[in-house]
Amino acid sequence: MKLIIGLGNPEARYSNTRHNIGFEAVEALAAAFGAPFSKGKGKYLVAKIRHRGEQLMLVKPMTYMNLSGHAVVAAMNFHKALRSDILVICDDMNLPSGTLRLRSKGSAGGQNGLKHIIESLGSEEFARLRIGIGLEEKPQGGYSSFVLGKFSTDERNVMNRTLEVCTEAILDFAVNGISHAMNHYNKPVS
């Protein structure tokens, strides 16, 4: 069993923002399998799918990005998941738009959702999939206004294709492991 955790903010006003691309990734995968989200045993929503004999629990924390660790710990405890069973999906403004970056472990790299998960787990030892949202220069309104901003039409087109490939990368992780997925998906989406 794998826990696939897409990070984002739960309110409707954050829908389709750059910061919610993690939510969009698990929503796209759930939709591809016709799996609805329902309330989990904690502050998260969960959808269940099965792929090639592997059960995947798709998780959307309802705690806001900066407190995601609470929902991750609750989901891990309820589903008896190990750190090696989880993949956290989040935005990364330091990666070019449409680039996927899988890692087996590492720092938060300035991403506050990852930072809180690391603090809550007491470890950086869990897989993550960062989706590049392409900050090219410091935005006038600051970083918050950028990550909480909506995608432009061109950016949305790139993200739609990126989410298709992201779905493949998640399934590859679930079946073949993080190293295999890293070797096949750590690149810009074309």
Swiss-Prot record:
Disulfide bonds: none
MF annotations from Gene Ontology: peptidyl-tRNA hydrolase activity; tRNA binding
UniProt xrefs under SUPFAM superfamilies: Peptidyl-tRNA hydrolase-like (SSF53178)
GO biological process: protein quality control for misfolded or incompletely synthesized proteins; rescue of stalled ribosome
Keyword list, A-Z: Cytoplasm, Hydrolase, RNA-binding, tRNA-binding
Record-listed E.C. numbers: 3.1.1.29
Principal subcellular localization: cytoplasm
Record-linked CDD domains: PTH
Catalysed conversion reaction: an N-acyl-L-alpha-aminoacyl-tRNA + H2O = an N-acyl-L-amino acid + a tRNA + H(+)
Residues binding tRNA: 14, 64, 66, 112
Active site per UniProt: 19
Lineage: superkingdom: Bacteria
InterPro entries attached to this UniProt entry: Pept_tRNA_hydro (IPR001328), Pept_tRNA_hydro_CS (IPR018171), Pept_tRNA_hydro_sf (IPR036416)
Stated name of the protein: Peptidyl-tRNA hydrolase
